[in-house]
Every structure is written in structure tokens, then in C-alpha cells.
A protein has these predicted regions:
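Class I S-adenosyl-L-methionine
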Residues: 95-128
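Conserved phosphate-coordination/catalytic loops
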Residues: 11-15, 52-59, 116-119
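Conserved Class I SAM-dependent methyltransferase catalytic core
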Residues: 58-107
């Protein structure tokens, strides 16, 4: 099937993530790619709107994922893996302890220092 055919039944929304709840049912698949949690002081850009997407916003998103999960929607969420810089950082492991967390290798080609480019671990969180 052509992508254009599949996309005829897709709704793409732009806004606060909580605004989508009225469109969600058990047949909904949601992929979330929020601003990534900074891994260090030099990678701390997370202000895509007037409010920074900080740890409190990450917690709010986690609670929202729980609501979506209760409805029966399929959820996939990506983010940075804090274990890249601190093996003991359990932030996402604790927030999403009832979900499946996979660590995947991702390439980074943008960095002011050539030595900072290369492979890093990212997380994929799913409820299926």
C-alpha cells in the first residue's frame, strides 16, 4: 500500500501533548518525540516553547502516557539515555517502570567538536 493511502487516515496535531486525549481510543498509535532530556550542561537546549521541557514536564508526560495506556492506545516514546553520562541515572527507568524500555544505538553527526560526534544510546519506551 502506498504511503499516501495510509496517510489519508492519519491526523497530525501540533500543540500541547495533553490536547490529543479527545482523539485517542484503543485503535490509536502514538509516537512521541519530546525535547530530549539534557545529558550534560552543553546539551541543555530544551526550550521549543515559552516553557522549557524540563524534568517536571517529563513527569507530566509520563502521567499522560499512563492515561493513554489505560485507554488502550499503543505508545512509543523516544528520548536521550541518561546512562550515556551517568550509569546510575534511573530517571526514565523509574518513570516508565511499567513499560518496555529498549536502548538503541543512534548516530550523532551534529556537534561543535568532531570528537563529540558518533554513536550514543537512546531509549525507546513502549507499552506493547
Amino acid at each position: 500500500m502506498a504511503v499516501s493511502e495510509v496517510l489519508k487516515n492519519v491526523i497530525i496535531l501540533n500543540g500541547d501533548f495533553e490536547d490529543i486525549i479527545k482523539y485517542v481510543d484503543k485503535n490509536t498509535f502514538i509516537y512521541m518525540d519530546p525535547p530530549y532530556r539534557p545529558l550534560n550542561a552543553s546539551s541543555n537546549f530544551n526550550e521549543y516553547s515559552k516553557e522549557p521541557f524540563n524534568d517536571d514536564a517529563q513527569r507530566r508526560l509520563s502521567k499522560f502516557c499512563n492515561e493513554l495506556n489505560e485507554i488502550g492506545a499503543k505508545i512509543m516514546k523516544s528520548n536521550s539515555d541518561p546512562k550515556n553520562t551517568d550509569e546510575n541515572d534511573e530517571f526514565f527507568d523509574e518513570l516508565y517502570s511499567n513499560y518496555n524500555i529498549s536502548r538503541i544505538s543512534a548516530s550523532r553527526s551534529i556537534n561543535s567538536k568532531g570528537t563529540g560526534r558518533g554513536k550514543v544510546s537512546e531509549i525507546l519506551i513502549t507499552n506493547y
